[in-house]
UniProtKB/Swiss-Prot annotation:
MF term (GO), any: thymidylate synthase activity
Subunit structure: Homodimer.
UniProt organism field: Pseudomonas aeruginosa (strain ATCC 15692 / DSM 22644 / CIP 104116 / JCM 14847 / LMG 12228 / 1C / PRS 101 / PAO1)
Record-given protein name: Thymidylate synthase
Pathway: Pyrimidine metabolism; dTTP biosynthesis
Length: 264
């Protein structure tokens, strides 16, 4: 994951100080891209230990179309707690937009189901896109989508995915986002009968929070370790049938976890 450390180092050396919504302050650059060959290993950061359980359950929760944290709480995942209301609701966030985008005529569009159907019918389509950024509903969301839009691409029997992340919390958020969309790419590839290709991460406002600088500097002193591999249950043939038990991370070795505060 040298690409990730290179981004962190670039922001430390060239980032502009900016105020932000949380009042914490950030050091920021605009526009950055990282590419990960999924055949070379699963892109889970090794310079600090990452909590894969949270990554997997969050992705499954998105795919369910859920916007209440009850499922996450049931499985010991607390990453959305700070934004939920007293009933555990978050408003029309990722899962709702992915699975039930409201159309003007009253219909609800299942973008994920449409994507899977299009992949099988016309894998060369340039419309293999899912968007979570719905301007009409931004004000109703507890947190507007940071990872806003992703697109799939098929070539030579391989499936690649590119994510556009408008707001990228480099220390805490980005390692989760890379692993989450890499995992989604593996899942979609298996169901569609394709091999995994690349995951391409494109960031807009790429920032380190001012209270993450010491942690980032510590991480930059560490040497990346070999990437692990991710095994999926080959019996799963429908994207919505995946369960937590269908994933096995093999050979993950990482440096110790580095704690940092979440900016809410």
């Amino acid at each position: 994951m040298k690409q990730y450390l290179d981004l962190m180092r670039h922001v430390r050396e060239h980032g502009t100080f900016k105020s932000d919504r949380t009042g914490t302050g950030t050091y920021s650059v605009f526009g950055h891209q990282m590419r990960f060959d999924l055949a070379a290993g699963f892109p889970l950061v090794t310079t600090k230990k990452c909590h894969l359980k949270s990554i997997v359950h969050e992705l499954l929760w998105f795919l369910k179309g859920s916007t209440n944290i009850a499922y996450l709480k049931e499985h010991g995942v607390s990453i959305w707690d700070e934004w939920a209301d007293e009933n555990g609701d978050l408003g029309p966030v990722y899962g709702y937009q992915w699975r039930s985008w409201p159309a003007p005529d009253g219909r609800h569009i299942d973008q994920i189901a449409n994507l899977m159907a299009m992949l099988k019918k016309n894998p060369d389509s340039r419309r293999l896109i899912v968007s979570a950024w719905n301007p009409a509903l931004i004000d109703e969301m507890a947190l507007p989508p940071c990872h806003a839009l992703f697109q799939f691409y098929v070539a030579d029997g391989k499936l690649s995915c590119q994510l556009y992340q408008r707001s990228a919390d480099i220390f805490l958020g980005v390692p989760f986002n890379i692993a989450s969309y890499a995992l989604l790419t593996l899942m979609v590839a298996q169901v569609a009968g394709l091999q995994p290709g690349e995951f391409i991460w494109t960031g807009g406002d790429c920032h380190l929070y001012a209270n993450h600088l010491e942690q980032a500097d510590l991480q930059l002193t560490r040497e990346p370790l070999p990437l692990p591999s991710m095994k999926l249950n080959p019996e799963v043939k429908d994207l919505f049938d995946f369960r937590f038990e269908d994933f096995e991370l093999v050979g993950y070795e990482a440096h110790p976890h580095i704690k940092a505060p979440v900016a809410v």
